[in-house]
């Protein structure tokens, strides 16, 4: 049987995938598709409401008589046919509402194939919508002015504006934001101009490249900028902006390395906004304005790998976008790949392999937490009726990266050169500005294999890839990549000494001299070791006293220490005070969700007490997920 026939057979077996409709949207984007959005937003801090007016242009894919959009907690005021100026009939279809997805907005308007249909919608947001956080002045660094920011990923743009809230329907976006003086509005586009009125300022932005709605972003606060390169300005509150500019000074180096691996950066500007500590993630790759957590400010640039990751999304995710959240790994696996190419260039192969080892630790932990047979451990999970937040984990990042690394090794070992780099550059060229499914990615790779190797060798490689196991099967992949390196070997020696009860004299100096990834790897291996929950006093003191990990270290190390503390049920008054302080000042879910869960397994009442104290501090997404975690604990 020829290679082409085998490929055709494989494609037929999985062809249904390419026809899958995004299960995370109510919209009929496959019948009539949004192409651009003109948004006008008036920010009211007194009511915590945005009054919005959006003009959405649609392209009809077929004849029809209804446009269906996503909404969640929006009050629709009017829907107007922009061509005629007449009101259109509409309804919020509450009969089909889902807590996880919101309420479909049905607009009754006839259209014909290829027709351009402009619709104007006036509406208001809700003060309680999870896609927007409103911060009172006391929750900011300056303590004088309020602050707000959006988080539209994963399916929360429908809380900011009515739209086809799916990655499958990318849009050109123009934005105006009216805010009270002296506040500044930032957006995921290029700044164009501003108009000052008596008590307000209106800011105008334009995003010329098509983006999915989850990348639409707005932030308003008392903000200042520091230009650190020709294309990067760092924004933050005045009290934080200089520290942030110093921490992220190497940003353009990261961009240049990513450009060398792919092609030129297309977004014009790469700006960074340092958000308040309630921001729930390490970073969010909003185009032209990456959002980052203040927990990255370590003072020594040791945590800027997050910036490298968000920069990588400028190609992986933002230019070439997964069609649905089911293929999230196509965004995050490629972003991890580019991040580790940046790390290889900056720090060397050994550090990049160590980074990959840490990633595999994370992958292992999260697969075991879900259970090896759980659908969410697959790279193609079933998401019908699911809020993607509930399925979210690092599995698409690290399993996706490991899959791509596996493909890279197969291709380059056969080619005896870095052919994979050439193929990936072609991938980012072929699919830029578009959305992509797993099947389109697979087809592209298999076509490239035939192009460079011919049918026989291509068949051997594509068979060795084992697509089904990597993409569809839950749990661990059958192939485990080799990331062995000398840096982790040194860490392993100290882990053995610690667990054997040997002397750790001088380890504090060694630990301080290690690369940040070595420290993270060592602590990860300690936590993963079954003996770590039964440390003797002298062993535990290595962390609590010799290294003093609960004080003065960056958030990665402090978070790991508190995990070790709770594993050993060290819940004396002093330990709990340190933990409570950490939880009250950090809103990043990566760190605080596991700590609340670990504390609840020891003392659920105490965990709930701390959570209730911080209820007004945490982002709504964070609060919902922690409450869901704790609801599963009975003690």
Residue ranges and their predicted role:
Residues 332-402, 461-474:
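Acidic/His/Gly-enriched intrinsically disordered linker/tail segments
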């Amino acid at each position: 049987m020829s290679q082409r026939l085998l490929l055709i057979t494989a494609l037929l077996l999985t062809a249904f995938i390419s026809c899958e409709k995004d299960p995370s949207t109510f919209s009929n984007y496959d019948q009539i598709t949004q192409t651009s959005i003109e948004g006008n937003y008036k920010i009211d801090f007194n009511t915590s409401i945005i009054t919005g007016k959006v003009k959405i242009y649609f392209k009809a894919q077929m004849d029809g008589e209804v446009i269906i959009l996503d909404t969640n907690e929006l009050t629709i005021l009017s829907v107007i046919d922009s061509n005629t100026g007449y009101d259109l009939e509409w309804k919020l279809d509450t009969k089909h509402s889902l807590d996880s997805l919101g309420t479909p907005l049905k607009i009754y308007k006839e259209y014909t194939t290829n027709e351009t249909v402009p619709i104007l919608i006036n509406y208001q947001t809700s003060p309680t919508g999870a896609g927007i956080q409103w911060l009172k002045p006391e929750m900011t660094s300056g303590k004088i002015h309020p602050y707000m920011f959006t988080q539209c990923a994963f399916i929360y743009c429908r809380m900011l504006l009515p739209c086809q809230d799916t990655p499958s329907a990318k849009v050109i976006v123009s934005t105006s934001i009216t805010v009270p003086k002296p506040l500044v509005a930032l957006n995921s586009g290029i700044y164009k101009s501003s108009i000052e009125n008596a008590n307000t300022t209106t800011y105008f932005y334009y995003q010329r490249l098509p983006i999915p709605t989850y990348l639409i972003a707005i932030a308003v606060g008392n903000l200042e900028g520091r230009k650190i390169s020709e294309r990067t300005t760092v924004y933050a509150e005045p009290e934080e902006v200089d520290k942030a500019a110093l921490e992220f000074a190497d940003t353009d180096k990261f961009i240049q390395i990513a450009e060398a691996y792919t092609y030129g950066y297309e977004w014009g500007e790469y700006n960074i906004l340092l958000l308040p500590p309630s921001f729930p993630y390490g970073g969010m790759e909003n185009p032209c304005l990456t959002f980052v957590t203040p927990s990255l400010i370590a003072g020594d640039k040791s945590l800027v790998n997050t910036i490298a990751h968000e920069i990588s999304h400028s190609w992986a995710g933002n230019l070439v976008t997964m069609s649905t959240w089911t293929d999230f790994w196509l965004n995050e696996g490629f972003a991890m790949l580019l991040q580790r190419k940046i790390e290889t260039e900056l720090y060397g192969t050994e550090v990049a392999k160590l980074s990959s080892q840490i990633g595999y630790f994370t992958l292992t932990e999260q697969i075991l937490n879900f259970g090896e047979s759980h659908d969410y451990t697959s790279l193609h999970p079933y998401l019908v009726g699911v809020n993607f937040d509930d399925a979210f984990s690092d599995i698409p990042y690290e399993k996706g990266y490991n899959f791509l690394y596996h493909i890279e090794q197969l291709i380059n070992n056969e080619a005896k050169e870095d052919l994979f780099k050439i193929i990936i550059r072609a991938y980012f060229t072929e699919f830029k500005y578009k959305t992509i499914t797993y099947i389109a990615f697979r087809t592209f790779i298999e076509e490239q294999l035939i192009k460079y190797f011919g049918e026989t060798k291509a068949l051997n490689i594509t068979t060795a890839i084992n697509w089904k196991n990597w993409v569809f099967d839950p749990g661990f992949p059958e192939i485990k990549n080799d990331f062995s390196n000398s840096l982790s070997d040194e860490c392993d020696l100290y882990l053995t000494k610690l667990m054997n009860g040997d002397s750790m004299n001088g380890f504090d100096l060694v630990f301080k001299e290690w690369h940040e990834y070595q420290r993270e790897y060592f602590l990860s291996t300690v936590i993963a070791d079954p003996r770590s929950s039964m440390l003797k006093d002298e062993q535990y003191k290595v962390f609590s006293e010799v290294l003093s990990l609960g004080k003065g270290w960056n958030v990665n190390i402090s978070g790991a220490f508190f995990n070790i503390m709770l594993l050993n049920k060290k819940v004396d008054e002093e330990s709990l005070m340190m933990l409570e302080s950490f939880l009250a000042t950090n809103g990043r879910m990566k760190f605080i969700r596991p700590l609340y869960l670990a504390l609840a397994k020891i003392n659920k009442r105490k965990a709930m007490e701390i959570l209730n104290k911080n209820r007004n501090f945490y982002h709504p997404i964070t609060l919902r997920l922690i409450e869901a975690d704790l609801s599963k604990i009975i003690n």
